[in-house]
Swiss-Prot record:
Pathway: Amino-acid biosynthesis; L-isoleucine biosynthesis; L-isoleucine from 2-oxobutanoate: step 2/4; Amino-acid biosynthesis; L-valine biosynthesis; L-valine from pyruvate: step 2/4. This is Ketol-acid reductoisomerase (NADP(+)). InterPro entries: 6-PGluconate_DH-like_C_sf (IPR008927), KARI (IPR013023), KARI_C (IPR000506), KARI_N (IPR013116), KARI_prok (IPR014359), NAD(P)-bd_dom_sf (IPR036291). Its cofactor is Mg(2+).
Length: 340
């Protein structure tokens, strides 16, 4: 059974006299820094000199300094920059300040799980991973609630690593909802698997393949877009609110019957075998090795994949149709922009 922890099991006073450095001020960094500060903790934000976020931190009324300065001042250092780049950042700016008794924290276990960051033996290494994007972590906290989080300890040099991580989660507001104990390996492997098989890779490939099937059969691309892309949100929202059962309660009996009869034809034993292989590649480190090498080589395949999908007909049609629907709050990525 999962171990769950709540507000009454976390002691925020453990961190009252432990300066905290938040490294990065993106989606999660912004939320962590502001929530912890509002919880009465001593927070500073570490950024590269000249970072575009420097002024934003100052506008938020928080202390801002270089990464190295923040790491030196802090007892707890939370790294909230993109996975690729963390190892170099750690080696050059954080590692020199990690004296025995300090804590190194993460919100995702990639660099610890795959050996890109190897902390010294004398420090605590833990993780607090809110299960929501940063803006939602902040929004729910301000409303008096919290989002669930995962918590893990990789290295407990002081004997209090878990209790400190739990207190940190309380500072974010996460123990108001509930915090689930896990391990760095479990969080990392399941997170990558979910992204690849369902949330990003699986859904994207399914949507494109279904769209292409309809268009090749002679149906209008606009109609195919509505059926295969646009309406997906309606179903996902039902999943989000009440799971598979609530979705099936909410759709027509015809749709539910098609769910039962057609779904297994899409997710076949061959599909499941591919899922198992993807998981094996994650567990063995093959995926991480490939991704790290891709970045070292300047991302040629990554950029080619991205450009190919930008030019896919479903994206061309989608841009036009979303202009008809201002109520969906359309967004467009400008050339050269990309995710973290």
């Amino acid at each position: 059974m999962a171990e769950l922890y709540y507000d009454n099991q976390a002691d925020l006073n453990r961190l009252k006299h432990k300066p905290i450095a938040i490294i990065g001020f993106g989606s999660q960094g912004h939320a962590h820094a502001r929530n912890l500060a509002d919880s009465g903790l001593d927070v500073r934000v570490g950024l590269y000199p000249g970072s575009k976020s420097w002024a934003k931190v100052e506008e938020a009324g928080l202390k801002v300094m270089t990464v190295a300065e923040a790491a030196r001042e802090a007892q707890i250092v939370m790294i909230l920059t993109p996975d690729i780049g963390q190892a170099e950042l750690y080696r050059e700016h954080i590692a020199p300040a990690m004296e025995p008794g300090k804590t190194l924290m993460f919100a995702h276990g990639f660099n610890i799980r795959f050996g890109q960051i190897v902390p010294p033996a004398g420090i605590d290494v833990s993780m607090v991973a809110p299960k929501a994007p940063g803006h939602r972590v902040r929004e729910v906290f301000v409303q008096g609630g919290g989002v669930p989080a995962l918590i893990a300890v990789e290295q407990d040099a002081t004997g209090g690593a878990f209790e400190d991580a739990l207190a940190y989660a309380k500072g974010l507001g996460c123990t108001r909802a509930g915090v689930l104990r896990t391990t760095f390996a479990e969080e990392t492997e399941t997170d990558l698997f979910g992204e690849q098989v369902v949330l990003c890779g699986g859904v994207s490939a399914l949507v494109k393949a279904a769209f292409e099937t309809l268009v090749e059969a002679g149906y209008q691309p606009e109609v195919a877009y509505f059926e295969c892309m646009h309406e997906l949100k309606l179903i996902v929202d039902l999943f989000y609110q009440g799971g598979l059962n609530y979705m099936r309660y909410s759709v027509s009996d015809t749709a539910e019957w098609g769910d039962y009869t057609a779904g297994p034809k899409i997710i076949t034993e061959q599909t499941r075998a591919a899922m198992r292989q993807i998981l094996a590649d994650i567990q063995s480190g093959a995926f991480a090795e490939d991704w790290i090498e891709e970045n070292h080589n300047g991302r040629p395949r990554f950029n080619a994949y991205r450009q190919a999908d930008i030019n896919h007909p479903i994206e061309q049609i989608g841009r036009e149709l979303r202009r008809m629907m201002p109520f969906v709050n359309p967004r467009e990525v400008k050339p050269g922009e990309g995710g973290a």
